[in-house]
Amino acid sequence: MRISLIAALCAGLATPSLAADSWTLFRDPKGTFTVEFPGTPAANHSSQPASDGTSVEETGYSLNTGTSTLMVLDSDFSRYKVDPIAAVENAATAAKNTAAQTQMEAVTHLDGQNGRALVVVDKNGNRMTDRIFFVGGHLYQVVALAPASLPQADSDRFVNSFHFAAH
């Protein structure tokens, strides 16, 4: 489902690092999370088919910088009975299945939430830095795509700036 969006955004990546002072805090309209983007992200709403024939609403916030694509995907599974651990593992497996190489994979913890951290490189030489969490019936995927030849600093800054809002 989200793999096609990620693959489409891999095309045409390559230029220098982003200016440190251009990053600003973005708060999603629902107030669920914050993340830093080096500009204003575009919002995209779509429906993805679920295994039972219904659809899962997905909201994405993304920014193509010319050197990379930075995005947060929010898939709303709140109408379904979903095993949070399995949802995170399935998303991680889907990301690894698109990769030619897995550079890093680990359990991660953020704001009291458990998740997965991945860095994979696809057959075209694009690196995907990914953080995956399942919180409150939503699957969150924080993704930075950039050519593997570029330094990892901007990708790390983006995924590490993501936080769940305190409620």
Language-model segments: residues:
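Signature of long, low-cysteine stretches enriched in small and polar/charged residues
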Residues: E36-G60, N90-V135
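Glycine-centered tight beta-turn/hairpin loop motif at sheet-sheet or coil-to-beta transitions
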Residues: K30-T32, T65-S68, K123-G125, G137
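Short N-terminal segments immediately surrounding and downstream of signal-peptide cleavage
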Residues: D21-F37
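Sec/Tat signal peptide C-region and signal peptidase I cleavage site
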Residues: T15-A19
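A short acidic-to-branched-hydrophobic micro-motif
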Residues: E58-A86, Y140-V142
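Sec-dependent N-terminal signal peptides
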Residues: I3-L13
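A mature extracytoplasmic/lumenal domain signature
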Residues: K30, G39-P41, D76-F77, D122, ...
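Surface-exposed amphipathic alpha-helical segments
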Residues: P29, P41-A43, A87-A99, H138, ...
